[in-house]
Amino acid sequence: MLLIITNEEDIHPNPVIDQLVKLNVPFFRLNTESLLSHYDITYAISNASHSFTIKYKDGSHAISSHDISSVWERRPIEPLTTFDDLAPNVSKLVLEEGDGFLRYFRYSLTHVPW
């Protein structure tokens, strides 16, 4: 499965996605700014291995680390928080954790073509 890492405002992946749909090529689009608001992430780490699953909160799409055959990264941006009721220091921590996850996430995919 192709993992497309981008942002919601980037329209350039859309024609590619249209072709992927026509050709029945499985893909998952990850809009990085929405990481903290639109996705559920499950991550498991042990001494022997690691794995993750990312799902749209609406349940429409999901991807597992075991499913990824290649990655296309195009214009990702830092995660944004939509949790307005958080204290500023907590909001800062949440954003740092989201950004840290994206960095480790990329590193965990070095075994597949980019």
Feature-to-residue mapping (PLM):
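Conserved N-proximal alpha/beta basic substrate-recognition cap immediately N-terminal to
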Residues: N7-Q19, L30-W114
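Extreme N-terminal starter segment of soluble prokaryotic enzymes
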Residues: M1-L3
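Short phosphate-binding/catalytic loops that engage adenosine nucleotides
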Residues: V25
